[in-house]
Amino acid sequence: MAKSDIHPKWYPEAKVYCNGQVVMTVGSTKPELHVDVWSGNHPFYTGTQKIIDTEGRVERFLRKYGMSSTQTSGEQTKK
């Protein structure tokens, strides 16, 4: 026989707070959820994300492993 009263209480209208404001309601086992970041203020979703690439990942890799950046991919596959 299944045990009774083992499941947590379910709150179908749990409020999600960000910076003291209710940003959405969700279903949860807690009545209130406090978050620092959500899709409404995250730079990726708001379009304010800045990509900072000071050196260039490919150039850094090529320099680190002593490969020349003038060699094309077609020359590498002929081997």
From Swiss-Prot:
Gene assigned in the entry: rpmE
Matching HAMAP family: Ribosomal_bL31_1 (MF_00501)
Stretches assigned to coiled coil: none
Pfam families xref list: Ribosomal_L31 (PF01197)
Quaternary structure note: Part of the 50S ribosomal subunit.
Protein name: Large ribosomal subunit protein bL31
Function: Binds the 23S rRNA.
Family matches, as Gene3D superfamilies: Ribosomal protein L31
GO molecular function: rRNA binding; structural constituent of ribosome
Keywords assigned: Ribonucleoprotein, Ribosomal protein, RNA-binding, rRNA-binding
GO CC annotations on file: ribonucleoprotein complex; ribosome
One biological process term in Gene Ontology: translation
Family under the similarity heading: Belongs to the bacterial ribosomal protein bL31 family. Type A subfamily.
